[in-house]
Amino acid sequence: VDFSYPVETRRSAGSRGFTLIELMVVVVIIGLLAAIAMPQIASRMRERRTNQAAQQIALLYRNARLRAMGRGFAVLVNYNSTSGFRVLETLPAGGLMNCAPMLPPSCTNTNWAVPTQTRVVETFNPGVYTGVLVGVTSQPSGAAASNLDLCFTPRGRAFSRTLAADELAPMTGLIDIQVGQAVPMLQRHVNVLPNGMARVSP
């Protein structure tokens, strides 16, 4: 009896590939899983960018305060809704080589608009994080501001103003910097306290 034909048939049936319908079912399942997962992944990415921007802004203010206390000269952080953040430090009278000026530059006796009296030591534009929006509210007025100058003295005190034409005045209320995206429930707050300390809160 010749059994070669059935054996060959069984081998051929066992080694066959996927049918077109089976491949289409697999593709549909993968597409459904991707559709379910993508919104969650996108939300996580937005949250991560928001957190990173908020932490970097808070660190910028902390470093500015420490720089003022360490150098013995005033340091100002300027926020502008268009250009972002700039950190400026005062220069000693006579330039960088003068280590002992008669009157150390401070928040109030420095003309921050004159390049010869200041220099930019750091910049940060939140726009590098896709979709991140920044807003500033000063207390106790609660008014939104498109510009904010916050100056730290060598003793760590903080002076602020929201208009460049105004005089810098001692901080008496909280400054709230909102960092978020155009998505509900996705926002972080950078709070700068009257003592100059900065912290991040939900």
Regions found by a protein language model. Name each.
Residues D2-R10, I21-M24, L32, I36-R62, ...:
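N-terminal helix-rich module
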